[in-house]
Amino acid sequence: MKPVKLFYQERCPFCKKALRYSEELKEEHPEFQPIEIEMIEETQHPDIADQYDYYYVPTFYVDGVKVHEAGIFKNEMEALLRKVIE
């Protein structure tokens, strides 16, 4: 399983939606349940966030590669989680 990093902001509505989709998909698809997402709140950890190339949140990195940046739909979140378990 590939490592996943999520850069987010606590008050970001798009970030909350992405997390909700992630939880829903884990309930709907048992193969996603073991996936762990390292969550990095960029305002609390600017030193880490500054090491990555992105502008908008939420931003997902899978295995060190940026795979999604900005708002996300549920079907996009499912595709992202599938990349993790490939």
Model-found features: residue ranges?
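A general structural signal for short secondary-structure boundary/capping elements
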Residues: E10, Y52-D53, R82-E86
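Non-catalytic interaction surface on structured domains
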Residues: L19-S22, H29-E31, V65, E76-E78
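Non-catalytic, surface beta->alpha helical segment in thiol-disulfide oxidoreductase systems
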Residues: Y61-E86
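Local sequence-structure signature of Cys/Sec-based thiol-disulfide redox active-site neighborhoods
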Residues: M1-E28
